[in-house]
Amino acid sequence: MYINYLKDLIGFKSVTPESDGAIEYIDDLLKQHGFKTEIKIFGDSKSEQATNLYAVFGSNEPNICFVGHVDVVPAGNHELWHNASPFKASHQDGKIYGRGAVDMKGAIACFLAASLDFIKNNTGFKGSISFLLTSDEEGKAKHGTKEMLQYIYDQGHKMDFAIVGEPTCEKEIGDTIKIGRRGSVNFKLNIEGLSGHVAYPHKANNPLPCLIKILNELTNIRLDKGTEFFQSSNLEVTNIDVGNNTSNVIPASTEASFNIRFNNLHSAETLAKQVEEIIKRYCKEYKVDYKLEYSSSADSFIQNPNDKIKDFADIVERVLKIKPEFSTSGGTSDARFVKDYCPLVEFGLLSETAHKINEYTKISDLQKLYDVYYNFLMEIL
């Protein structure tokens, strides 16, 4: 059934933060199989509203919760897709093409099939199964999983273990389990100099030499050497703007943006302090003023592999005959919110085609993911 579920889900044009009926489709399906469900819409303005679903079967412990998102990134030029239709699943050569196939409607389809089959085959099992789904993960992630977690806990619900269905695997299904994520902090630096004619530099103060020195040091500094589960923290310059299209004018100001992806040796605050010390030193040398702003969308986190995390890894190895690696690589995900409530793993399909034109998953990979999810439920519940 996971193939049919995936095809149906791809058919919803759920570009973030829109659900376009995907949440409602899952809600109806789960209701038909005895789940208690609730849809909540959070967000003040229409453009920011997110549709969220919590569904639960059973009331006993332990509760295994699948956390995911139905929203997808824009599909780009539709003409470049198979059948020129990214929101109509295309089944070719043992693959299913469509926006969201791996990120992450494929994982949702697999857990839907696994959980419904498990319930059918195991009446009276000892625990409970739940879904927490949102249409707001690929965008701002303000009114999705974060708000829904707080809401369901206020209602008395509890999760004992969560599976976040992000596309985590690198080369084959089962090679990677995420147990943490790097943090992310964005910086915007504005340096104010004094404009003037390029022929009279002594009557001006060009802010660019100062910025060049700052960025050179920032991009060459070694923030750390990494840890057991984390690669070293990394700074990338993302934009430089002087707003000057004239070749004979020294600019009055310049602006640069950069991002740091950091491990658990840092926080956004400690990095901001380190960055500002460098900026302050060069701005004093060049006698220019500066303004530094920063915002963090996620802190770094890491979980020590507990019994259920190890159980999950053992299931992967037993079912797929591959020993998974614990990893923290990649970007941010909603796992950063879930980790405050319960232990978790992130485990899904291959990440190779996520967000790309002609995103696809192999049907054989869907079967493998289904097998892992089903066998984990059998082991724990």
Swiss-Prot record:
Q: Which UniProt keywords apply?
A: Amino-acid biosynthesis, Cobalt, Diaminopimelate biosynthesis, Hydrolase, Lysine biosynthesis, Metal-binding, Zinc
Q: What class of enzyme is it?
A: hydrolase
**Pathway(s) it belongs to:** Amino-acid biosynthesis; L-lysine biosynthesis via DAP pathway; LL-2,6-diaminopimelate from (S)-tetrahydrodipicolinate (succinylase route): step 3/3
Task: List GO BP terms, alphabetically.
Answer: diaminopimelate biosynthetic process; L-arginine biosynthetic process; lysine biosynthetic process via diaminopimelate
Catalytic site = 71, 137
UniProt cross-references to Pfam families, sorted A to Z: M20_dimer, Peptidase_M20
Q: Which SUPFAM superfamilies match?
A: Bacterial exopeptidase dimerisation domain, Zn-dependent exopeptidases
One MF annotation (Gene Ontology) recorded for this entry: succinyl-diaminopimelate desuccinylase activity
Positions annotated to bind Zn(2+) 2: 103, 138, 355
Record carries keyword 4Fe-4S: no
Q: Which reaction does it catalyse?
A: N-succinyl-(2S,6S)-2,6-diaminopimelate + H2O = (2S,6S)-2,6-diaminopimelate + succinate
Q: What Enzyme Commission number does this protein have?
A: 3.5.1.18
Kindly list the cofactors needed.
Zn(2+); Co(2+)
What does this gene product do? Catalyzes the hydrolysis of N-succinyl-L,L-diaminopimelic acid (SDAP), forming succinate and LL-2,6-diaminopimelate (DAP), an intermediate involved in the bacterial biosynthesis of lysine and meso-diaminopimelic acid, an essential component of bacterial cell walls.
The annotated subunit structure for this chain is:
Homodimer.
- The protein's name is Succinyl-diaminopimelate desuccinylase
What is the organism of origin for this protein?
Rickettsia felis (strain ATCC VR-1525 / URRWXCal2)
